[in-house]
């Protein structure tokens, strides 16, 4: 999907890790939400409240889910899921353009 139609977007940006991750919240008519943003190169750890589906639009990264020892590489057009009440480490090698869907 190249665009979201009939949605609301929160104007205030979500800025994390001293600006290394910047996103905006998108609210869908059915009550679900997502964030659309970028993560700049570096290594970060994110905590999750609800399950997440991360869609990579462009860029490159490696991800390691909580409790796992192996890293998995992701690039444009790929997705990964993260359980709720968990965390994941991410190493971004090329600025990541992403959509994070909250389930």
Curated annotation (Swiss-Prot):
<comment type="function">
    <text>Catalyzes the phosphorolysis of diverse nucleosides, yielding D-ribose 1-phosphate and the respective free bases. Can use uridine, adenosine, guanosine, cytidine, thymidine, inosine and xanthosine as substrates. Also catalyzes the reverse reactions.</text>
</comment>
<dbReference type="InterPro" id="IPR009664">
    <property type="entry name" value="Ppnp"/>
</dbReference>
<dbReference type="Pfam" id="PF06865">
    <property type="entry name" value="Ppnp"/>
</dbReference>
<dbReference type="GO" id="GO:0009032">
    <property type="term" value="F:thymidine phosphorylase activity"/>
</dbReference>
<dbReference type="InterPro" id="IPR014710">
    <property type="entry name" value="RmlC-like_jellyroll"/>
</dbReference>
<dbReference type="GO" id="GO:0047975">
    <property type="term" value="F:guanosine phosphorylase activity"/>
</dbReference>
<keyword id="KW-0328">Glycosyltransferase</keyword>
<dbReference type="InterPro" id="IPR011051">
    <property type="entry name" value="RmlC_Cupin_sf"/>
</dbReference>
<keyword id="KW-0808">Transferase</keyword>
<comment type="similarity">
    <text>Belongs to the nucleoside phosphorylase PpnP family.</text>
</comment>
<dbReference type="GO" id="GO:0004850">
    <property type="term" value="F:uridine phosphorylase activity"/>
</dbReference>
<protein>
    <recommendedName>
        <fullName>Pyrimidine/purine nucleoside phosphorylase</fullName>
        <ecNumber>2.4.2.1</ecNumber>
        <ecNumber>2.4.2.2</ecNumber>
    </recommendedName>
</protein>
<dbReference type="GO" id="GO:0004731">
    <property type="term" value="F:purine-nucleoside phosphorylase activity"/>
</dbReference>
<dbReference type="GO" id="GO:0005829">
    <property type="term" value="C:cytosol"/>
</dbReference>
């Amino acid at each position: 999907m190249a665009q979201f139609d009939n949605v609301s977007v929160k104007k205030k940006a979500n800025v994390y890790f001293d600006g290394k991750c910047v996103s905006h919240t998108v609210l869908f008519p059915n009550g679900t939400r997502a964030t659309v943003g970028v993560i700049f190169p570096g290594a970060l750890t994110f905590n999750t409240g609800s399950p997440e589906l991360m869609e990579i639009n462009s860029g490159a990264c490696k991800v390691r889910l909580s409790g796992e020892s192996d890293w998995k590489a992701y690039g444009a057009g790929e997705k990964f899921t993260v359980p709720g009440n968990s965390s994941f480490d991410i190493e971004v090698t090329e600025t990541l353009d992403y959509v994070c869907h909250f389930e």
